[in-house]
Structures are given as structure tokens and as C-alpha cells.
Amino acid sequence: MSQLTPMMRQYLEIKAGYPDAILFFRLGDFYEMFLDDAVKASRILDITLTSRNKNSDGADVPLCGIPYHSATPYIAKLIEAGEKVAICEQVEDPKSVKGIVRREVVKVITPGLVVDSSNLSPKENNYLLSLYCDDATTWGLSYLDLSTGEFRVTELDGFDAAVAEVACVKPREIILPAVFRENGRMKELMPVTAGLATTFVDDWVYDLDYCKRLIGSHFGGASPSALGCDGLNTGLYAICAVLHYLQETQKGRAGHVNSIIPYTNREYLVLDESTRRNLELTATLAEGKRKGSLLGLMDRTTTAMGGRKMKQWINYPLVTIQSITERQDAIEEFVQDPSRRTALVFLLNGVYDLERLNGRISLASAGAKDLVAMKESLARIPGIKELLASSSSVLLRRLNEGLNPLPDLVGLIAGGIVENPPFVLRDGGIIADGYNAELDELRAISREGKGFIARLEAQEKGRTGINSLKIRYNKVFGYYIEVTKTNLTSIPADYIRKQTLANAERYITPELKEYEDKVLGAEDRIRELEFSLFQEIRETVTGHGEIVARTADCLATLDVLASLAELAHERNYCRPLVDDGTTLFISEGRHPVIEAMHQGERFVPNDTLLDNGENQLIIITGPNMAGKSTFMRQVALITLMAQMGSFVPATEAHISLVDRIFTRVGASDNLARGQSTFMVEMMESANILRHATPKSLVILDEIGRGTSTFDGVSIAWAVAEFLHDNDKHAAKTLFATHYHELTELAVTRKRIKNFNIAVKEWNEQIIFLRKIVSGGASHSYGIQVARLAGLPLEVIERAKEILQNLEKGEFAEEGIPRIARGKKSAGSAPASQLSLFDSGEDMLRKRLKGMDVTTLTPLEALNLLDELKRMV
């Protein structure tokens, strides 16, 4: 190392502290990367890889670099690739230092710690999540959005609950204890950590005393109890890992992270990963797009922070009637007063993302434009408060109280920062005239000096008679007089030559040099003073961060309420009655998303009645494409919307609180976990049967179709019986099936009812009426659906022939079903499993044909007679 240059020694010393990050090493106007970092970064960023002086072993040192003033898109590309970036700045002025300039890493940017708005999706959070579990079954989970300051923590009972919550949060980066790599936990977590940036924290961090000290240090001496985290155990360790990581990466700058929000699953309607996916709450199943999801429909918010809160409300519906009613009252007030709603939306339209502005200001990464955006946002609040002043809604009054316009802060920014400041702080032109006397004086000197230069140029042109004479400036020579070579004979004696060019000479004079020193000195001082004054203003704004955060949260909530009111008004939704009973009644319910996406068609509404009495389990039969899945999903979505506090797509609705919504809708192979379609289906079903309660809502679509017919109907039958007979798990259930045999359950189970999707037959065609009617379906209409799907006519005709054989119970003499032989086949086909719909008479005939009555003992004959009796 002694053979290395001082700069490379400094680089390697700093790099040693950040081995897992790409080090952006500031050299003048560039960030340089060396060695392995350079090789990796050049490949990801598609920039030139070069080399510089050889290192101690004689090899070239790989090198690449980017301009510091345009680093943002390059950093974003590295973060998107899952890399971490350590920003190493010069912390001394090179002009005032002899030798190597001192450098330090000022922050580390990771996928979970992005704060630059240009690298973030406005209506999506960017979470860093920490997960911890000791030898017990309780998992601690905390997550932070550094860009907004939102910090939450919970404890979850069991691995499945922890995995479900990680899937709901959708973090960009996850923090895990280093010991997880050794004790097998990492392998368990692979399905949820795949594709995530993962950081392992040293095990010593998970020490209770250290955790309490770290929490107290970050939150101004507050204890976990004072922060509302009393009673947490594993959750404290999850918090500690996040704070430790912040300390390591942000160098103490995270003052806007000033509170923790503890929560439990009991506070919200529980939705597992499968349910969120199947109901397409925030993304579509097919493409993973926002458009076409419930969020895509409901989000009419004006602000980015309102959009993020809307998603949070959808992911975490409420289970407290008071909170739901408060939201309903606020929405109803806006529905009934459209002019006030319109005025509110207009004012919100001028509000920037206060949460993320507040975050950048706290992290000292905000520019002057950010301060102006905050000023303009806060300036809208008096008008909003005036609109809310007459509200009768408890929630709207509370939100109004939480809004603080901070007039002194608005005045400070308005008086200190120009209306349209430049992006680059060091360029100057940020501070308004009249804000600082010294700055005003320096600007006057600068303006006067520039005026002098213009007058001097005119004077010299007159004195020399050289009309082409120019006074110019560059960073190397400062101000100079440029004269073309054709005019050199007219040069005065007091001109001092500075530089010879091909077609001109450059000169200075003592008078020009004197004014140069005065003007340039003033401009340097102006830039320094402006930056210092800007930092003072930004620091003052930082001190109001907690108030700004509360105000931003109130504005986001208002935005969501106005959005839900707009949706209710536009789509003619009703206010549901929500209580703590056992009834789920919906009159003329519609699927919110499908109705909105097919506005040219009339959506057929349907009624629903579920309870814990005579209508606990509804079996729904009918052909594919008739609308069974749509109906069941709409019931689940209406229930969820009601518990969000939203109005719902129906003419009337009475929704008793549910604790969980389960869905078993469709399936696909999970090759990553080595699970087949049927295995996925059975695992989801098992989860439902373990956790469903009488207060749950269960949606089951085609249980058992991933295996043989007899296996499938047996499983479906047993699942239905379990949900009916087991009082502990007797959830309100919608059960769609193609197994018509399941309709027999209504005969023996008093709380099971049969319904089907009405279909009209006409000229061998079917028309789906989309209406749910009482009773089981008489036909499956599979062949008609196949015709609609475009199967070849030959296949359709053969299917009809086979169906007739099945319905008549026709078999060949050797017991092989006639469906095994087509018209063109020859020879005997191997025996196959009989259809579920084989006639009982044929089964009886086969049994009789296969027995030898001459060899039966009396006891065997009696047993056989009993068996035959049961068969008929």
C-alpha cells in the first residue's frame, strides 16, 4: 500500500468501511469509481471503463466516472439494479488545503432508503422492512418509508402471518439478523425475499439494552413505553435494526422520523396474500397493473400523499364501528355538498407532496425549489380550513384542527427565497433581494462592477479606435481585452500581454485587474453567503417538521375522503349500515371494477344474504362464464369497501363486521416452491379451515378441480361440511362449484342453501342472464360454453355424443364406457375412471354381473344384500 498514491490510499481506507456499496468518490466535478466498483458500475450504467496509474502490484486500476451535478439518474439506475451507493464528498475547500483533501461518506443510498422524488413513484411508498424472530413463534416486523418518515411496528403470531404481512407491505429492501443465514430461517424466507435487496445486521445489534439506548437516542430520550411500544418484545428488535441501519447510512440526519406507529392484526380486517391477489386489490392478476384493480378504480386523489393513503386504507380495512362511521359521515357530507367538495379538490390540486418535501428537508437534501413548493402548499391551508369550518362531521372537524398553515414559516420562505430559484444551489440566485443587507450590498458591487466593464469597453474602443475590441472573461485568465492581429499597431503602451492566439492577442490593464478583483471577490462571497442563508432557512423549516408531518397527514386523509365522495356520487353508491351483528345483506350489488370498465353495458345487479343462521353457506352452481366468480368477488369487495368506511355499489347494504376475508379462487403452479396447482389449492384451503371464524367471510371457487373427479368432489364435500358443522369455524361462505352433487348438502345441512346463475337456452345456444336465483343448476352447459369459445364443430359434436352416453349410462359389454371409443377408433380402449355422473343402475348391474352366488356363505349373502340395497 506504500506504493499507492495518497489519493488511492484514502480511497481504499474509505472503501473498506463500505464493502457492499459502490463508492462514489468525489474528485472535483466528478464522482469516480475504482477497481471492482468501476467494473460493476460501468456495466450497469453503460459508461466507459478506463484505467489509471498502476497499483502496488503493477496492474492497471479500473476507473469510471460521472459528473457530480448529473449523478441522480445514474444513482437511480444502480439502485434499480439492487445496488447500494455510498456518497463520498470533499468536506474541505480544496483552495484552502495543502495536499490531499479530506473526504467522508455523507450518506448511503440503498433501495429501501431512496428519498429523491425523481426516483420514486409518487403514489407508492418505498419501504425498508426489518424482520426478527427469536426461538419462539412471535415475529417482530417494522417498516420505514424514509422519504415520508412513516415508521410502523407490529408483532405477528407465526411464520405464515409474518410472510403475509411482508407481502402486503411490499418493501424494496429487507433487513434480517445475520444469524438467519445459519439457522435455516433464510431458506424459509426465500419466497418473500426473492428479488428484494437484503441486508444482514450483526447479531450484537439485537441486544435489549442497546435497543433501548438506540431508541432513546433517536427519539430524544423517549422510552419504548412513551412511544406507544410498551409490551413489545420481538418488535423492539425489529425497530432497533432499522434505527441502527439509519445511523449507519444517514449519518444522524433523519429527524423527520419522529414517531412510531404500533399496530396489531386485531385492529384491521385481516387479508392474506392470496386474498389480496385474488381480489385484485392493488394490482391485476394478469398483468400486475394498477389499472383494473380496486385501487385503480377508487383512487381519485389529487395529491401523491393522498394516493398513498388510499392504498393503505384498501390494504387495512377497519374493524371498529366508530372509526368506520366517522369516515362515512365525512364522505356523506362531501357527497351532499358537491360545491364544497369541488372547492376542496381545487385547493388540494395546488398542494405538493408535503410528506416527501418534509423528508428531504430533514435529510438536508432539499433544494430551494422544495422550499418554495412547501410555501405554496402551506399557503393553501387557510382556504381549506375555511371550507371545513362549518363541518358537522367529527372526523372533518378533527382534521381541520390538525391543519396548521404555519404563516410565519410561509412568510420566511416568501421573504427569503426567490419565486423561481435555480435547481443548483451553488449557482446562486436563490435568496430574494431585501432579505439580507450584506448580500444586497455585494450584489450592488457586482452589478456596478459589471457596468464598469461595459463602460470600460466603450472607453477603450474610443481611446484606441479599435471597434472590434472586446472585454471578455474566462475562469483561467479572468477579465481580459481581446484585440485582433490586424489592429495590433493601435495597442496603447499600458496594455499588458497575457495570451497570444492564432488571430488575436489578449491583454489586461491595471485598472481592469483592480475591478476584476472587486467584482469576482463579490461574486464568490455572494455564492458563499447565499448558500449559508439558504441553509439557515432550511434549518428553520426543519424545526417545524413534526407540525408539517401532522398537517400533511390531515391533507392526505381529506384527499382520500373527497376521492371516495366523488366516486360515490359518480357511480351512485349507497352508504352501508355497518354493525357488529351477523348479517351480510346486499341489495342490487354490483362489482365495482367490472361495472366501471364496461360502461357501455348494463351490469346486472344481484342480491346477497349471508348470516350465521339459515344462510351461512351458499352453494352456487352454473356454467363457466355465467358470472359465479364475479358475483362472489363483488360480495367480498363490497364488504371490504364498507369496512374501509367507503360507500358501496348497491342500492342498500347491511354489513356486519367481518374479521377476515378468505378467497380460494383459481390457482397456478408455484414452481419456485415446487408446488403444483393442486398443492397450492390445498394449502390455501387448509389455511382457511385453520383460521376461519364465525365472523369471517369465505369465498371458495371450484375446490378440488385440480385432481381426479372422485377425489375432487370428496374434498369439496368435506370442506363444505367442515365449514358448516364446526361451530368454531362456521364462517359465512360462498361456495361455487361444478360438482352438482354438492347441492345435496342442503337437504341434510340446515344452514346450507343452493343458488345458481340463471341461463336461457335458445336454438342450442345459451344466454347468460347473470342473475343469481334460488336452487341448484340443472345443467353445466359445458358444451355450449365450448361452442362460444370457438372449439371446432367436430369436437363439439363428439362431445354431445359422449354426453348422451354418459347421461344414458351406456357401456360396452366388457364394462368399458362407450365414450372411450370414437367413430374412427379401433380395438378396445383401456378402462378409465368412470365419470362422477355414471348411473347408479349401471354400477348395480356391473356388481351383480361380477359375483358368483353359488359360492356365497349365508353371512356373505346378507352383507352383499345390504350393500346392494345401499347402492339403490
Curated annotation (Swiss-Prot):
GO terms for cellular component: cytosol. ATP binds at G622, P623, N624, M625, A626, G627, K628, S629. Transmembrane segments: none annotated. Gene3D superfamilies: 1.10.1420.10, DNA repair protein MutS, domain I, MutS, connector domain, P-loop containing nucleotide triphosphate hydrolases. Disulfide bonds: none annotated. GO terms for biological process: mismatch repair. Keywords: ATP-binding, DNA damage, DNA repair, DNA-binding, Nucleotide-binding. This protein is involved in the repair of mismatches in DNA. It is possible that it carries out the mismatch recognition step. This protein has a weak ATPase activity. Belongs to the DNA mismatch repair MutS family. This is DNA mismatch repair protein MutS. It comes from Geotalea uraniireducens (strain Rf4) (Geobacter uraniireducens). The gene is mutS.
